[in-house]
Amino acid sequence: MLGKNDPMCLVLVLLGLTALLGICQGGTGCYGSVSRIDTTGASCRTAKPEGLSYCGVRASRTIAERDLGSMNKYKVLIKRVGEALCIEPAVIAGIISRESHAGKILKNGWGDRGNGFGLMQVDKRYHKIEGTWNGEAHIRQGTRILIDMVKKIQRKFPRWTRDQQLKGGISAYNAGVGNVRSYERMDIGTLHDDYSNDVVARAQYFKQHGY
């Protein structure tokens, strides 16, 4: 217990609280880290349309490398949103790469037969569109949707590690929480049955390149 004559102790306590608040405000690891997630990478069904003769993590990294130049246009926004919402910017970049190749395949900001909007392909049938297709408001909306999926997976699978729950949330971003039934088979039912594995492998690449 601090006394009136313990100013140094009080200073140390305040410094500790300040440091703790700094971690909470500026951190990006609230939902786990892609660096610790196991992944099989892209399926051949995802890799083949990209003109690749190989599959797996190597294919995911090749695709991410191709997207890096375009992704870097949004790096500041992606990192800002990641820090604000306490999730790794690399995860956001991985989803943007998978959903829109960092905007390269969109037409006037739209994809998925006119249903998906923006870099993160927010579906207009289920969400009220926010911001411009490549702006911070859009990235923030897509990331909030992702975090909501992660939180629902946390409640559904409380015994999973944070990293496993993050991977489950990524899978649910594509096919919904109901599609995630087990850790090993969470991607069955996602597009090409590889969504979270491909996104995680791409995210690992982006994390190694400053995201």
UniProtKB/Swiss-Prot annotation:
<keyword id="KW-0732">Signal</keyword>
<keyword id="KW-1015">Disulfide bond</keyword>
<keyword id="KW-0081">Bacteriolytic enzyme</keyword>
<keyword id="KW-0964">Secreted</keyword>
<feature type="signal peptide">
    <location>
        <begin position="1"/>
        <end position="26"/>
    </location>
</feature>
<protein>
    <recommendedName>
        <fullName>Lysozyme g</fullName>
        <ecNumber>3.2.1.17</ecNumber>
    </recommendedName>
</protein>
<dbReference type="GO" id="GO:0050830">
    <property type="term" value="P:defense response to Gram-positive bacterium"/>
</dbReference>
<dbReference type="GO" id="GO:0031640">
    <property type="term" value="P:killing of cells of another organism"/>
</dbReference>
<keyword id="KW-0378">Hydrolase</keyword>
<dbReference type="GO" id="GO:0003796">
    <property type="term" value="F:lysozyme activity"/>
</dbReference>
<feature type="disulfide bond">
    <location>
        <begin position="44"/>
        <end position="55"/>
    </location>
</feature>
<feature type="disulfide bond">
    <location>
        <begin position="30"/>
        <end position="86"/>
    </location>
</feature>
<keyword id="KW-0929">Antimicrobial</keyword>
<dbReference type="InterPro" id="IPR023346">
    <property type="entry name" value="Lysozyme-like_dom_sf"/>
</dbReference>
<dbReference type="GO" id="GO:0009253">
    <property type="term" value="P:peptidoglycan catabolic process"/>
</dbReference>
<feature type="active site">
    <location>
        <position position="112"/>
    </location>
</feature>
<feature type="active site">
    <location>
        <position position="99"/>
    </location>
</feature>
<dbReference type="InterPro" id="IPR002152">
    <property type="entry name" value="Glyco_hydro_23"/>
</dbReference>
<dbReference type="GO" id="GO:0005576">
    <property type="term" value="C:extracellular region"/>
</dbReference>
<keyword id="KW-0326">Glycosidase</keyword>
<comment type="similarity">
    <text>Belongs to the glycosyl hydrolase 23 family.</text>
</comment>
